[in-house]
């Protein structure tokens, strides 16, 4: 109803895949029924770009970091004395760019207070370079699918496709899990990647897979939890 209300005023409805996605589950197979016009995902890492790109929605947009705030999420200075937002942007873009070569994103942007960049002209110059690189990468996707080797990889955990690419948080929130490092590596590799559940295994999905990765902590949903007790 809310989306219909937005459309009735001639506007487009986007969902922010960070603060306001709970309950709409972009990977539950029915997300498209809502009728959103686009999805926005803030990103630090490549796997988050793939998380956004794989959703059934017309427009996929990334909100790049660092945000235009005086301090970052961890409290370190960003757009203030002692901060180096250009270095931050380079670090995050290097990670995100790998994934953009594998899956198409339609738009990129920044969030925060625009006036804060006035004292950081090098940041503005670098973001101009980022925008040019993004347009070039997007133009490659307009020409066709990227090259993939024949290897088909499946990441196996309890959630399966419902939690494709993610461990329910940013990299700095989930870095202690081996699986998030694996997801990040896969996000930029030229292989077909899918996320499967143990129910999928029961229904024969492994016949379409060359490599299975199960890398969650023992006993957790990311390894399969009690699914391993089913013999």
Predicted regions and their residues:
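Glycan-processing catalytic domains of CAZymes
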Residues: 1-230
């Amino acid at each position: 109803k809310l989306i219909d209300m937005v459309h009735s005023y001639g506007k487009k409805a986007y969902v922010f895949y960070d603060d306001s996605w709970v309950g709409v589950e972009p990977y539950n197979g029915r997300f498209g029924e809502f009728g959103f016009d686009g999805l926005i995902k803030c990103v630090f890492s490549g796997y988050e770009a793939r998380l956004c790109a794989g959703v059934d929605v017309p427009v996929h947009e990334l909100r790049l970091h660092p945000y235009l705030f005086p301090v970052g999420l961890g409290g370190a200075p960003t757009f203030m004395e002692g901060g180096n937002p250009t270095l931050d942007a380079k670090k995050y873009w290097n990670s995100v760019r790998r994934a953009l070569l594998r899956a198409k994103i339609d738009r990129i942007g920044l969030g925060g207070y625009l006036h804060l960049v006035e004292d950081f002209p090098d940041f503005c110059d670098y973001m101009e370079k980022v925008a040019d690189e993004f347009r070039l990468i997007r133009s490659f996707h307009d020409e066709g699918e990227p090259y993939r080797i024949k290897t088909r990889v499946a990441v196996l955990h309890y959630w399966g496709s419902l939690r494709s690419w993610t461990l329910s948080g940013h990299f700095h929130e989930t870095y202690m899990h081996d699986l998030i490092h694996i997801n990040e590596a896969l996000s930029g590799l030229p292989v077909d990647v899918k996320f499967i559940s143990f129910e999928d295994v029961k229904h024969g999905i492994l016949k379409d897979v060359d490599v299975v990765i199960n890398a969650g902590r023992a006993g957790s949903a990311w390894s399969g939890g009690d699914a391993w007790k089913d013999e």
